[in-house]
Design a protein with these regions (language model features):
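Short, glycine/serine-rich, charged loops/turns that create anion-binding
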Residues: 60-61, 91, 179-180, 217
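Cysteine-cluster motifs in flexible loop/terminal segments that predominantly coordinate metals
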Residues: 93-123
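N-terminal beta1-alpha1 ligand-phosphate binding loop
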Residues: 51-80, 181
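A short beta-strand-loop structural module common to alpha/beta enzyme folds
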Residues: 83-93
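Residue-level recognition of beta-strand->loop/alpha-helix junctions
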Residues: 57, 88, 213-214
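Glycine-rich phosphate/pyrophosphate-binding loop and the adjoining helix
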Residues: 14, 18, 26-34, 45, ...
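Helix-loop-strand module that forms the ligand-binding subsite of alpha/beta enzymes
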Residues: 3, 8, 13-18, 22-25, ...
Length: 243
């Protein structure tokens, strides 16, 4: 027990010294301490350096709740120093997958190049992905599914045993909304169904899912509450902390 207490005190002292060094370096300027000090490589605490985040908005409604929630996440991430890009699947030009399976052996889609390849490249370059989708028949909207169908070769590779994830090391947040109120949105697998579909894609691709948000009852409660907004901010906070 004595050694454990000594180890804890040693760690506390080390962390305190780091804080003192950063405070002295930036002369007590808390804005610079956060953006430059705690995000620098010299800091060994829990906050991770800024990175690239790609937001995939599966909602066709740019002023809907999904778009609002993703907007809050974007604002919070940019405030913390991340580079953020957003893609609206409804704006993409993507032809349907034909199921020819040629991409599994060639490592690329043999159909004419369109936005599916462009977004895939953005995903490959990102450190984290945020997927947001309203519930359509207990699933994600067709526009979003269409895009992911065409990207499978860049997200997982077939092997003689289990699929090999190609997005390993990247993090992910999933959010969904539906008209069905809580708890029926979960019990009847409405928003939960959309989350399940996105989780399946993320899991086989190798993403580490750090947070999921489900918001039911969008007809009865069409405005975001402060609690909803706080959940979005907390998800970004968790994204920054989880390695």
């Amino acid at each position: 027990m004595r050694y454990r207490e000594e180890a804890i005190e040693c760690v506390k002292d080390h962390v305190l010294q780091i804080h003192k060094q950063i405070y002295a370096k930036y002369e007590g300027d808390f804005d610079r301490i956060y953006t430059e000090g705690y995000n620098s490589k010299s800091y060994t605490g829990r906050v991770i350096e800024p990175g690239k985040i790609l937001i995939i908005n599966g909602s066709p409604r740019k002023k809907g709740l999904i778009s609002q929630m993703l907007g809050i996440m974007r604002e919070e991430a940019e405030k913390r120093g991340d580079m953020v890009e957003m893609v609206y699947t409804n704006d993409l030009t993507v032809k349907p997958c034909t199921g020819c399976m040629a991409c599994r052996t060639k490592g690329k889609c043999v159909l004419a190049e369109d936005d599916s390849q462009r977004v895939l490249q953005m995903m490959q370059q990102a450190d984290a992905i945020i997927m947001g989708a309203p519930c359509y028949w207990g699933n994600i909207p067709g526009q979003m599914k269409l895009m992911f169908d065409r990207q499978v070769y860049g997200m997982m590779r077939d092997t003689n045993r289990f699929p090999e994830p190609l997005m390993k090391g990247k993090k992910c947040i999933l959010i969904s909304t539906c008209t069905t109120p809580w708890p029926w949105n979960i019990l009847f697998k409405q928003s939960r169904g959309a989350i399940r579909a996105m989780r399946e894609i993320a899991r086989y691709a190798g993403f580490k899912i750090v947070s999921t948000i489900e918001r039911g009852g969008t007809v009865m409660h069409p405005e975001l509450t402060e609690k909803d907004k706080q959940k979005c901010r907390k998800a970004i906070e968790r994204l920054m902390k989880v390695k």
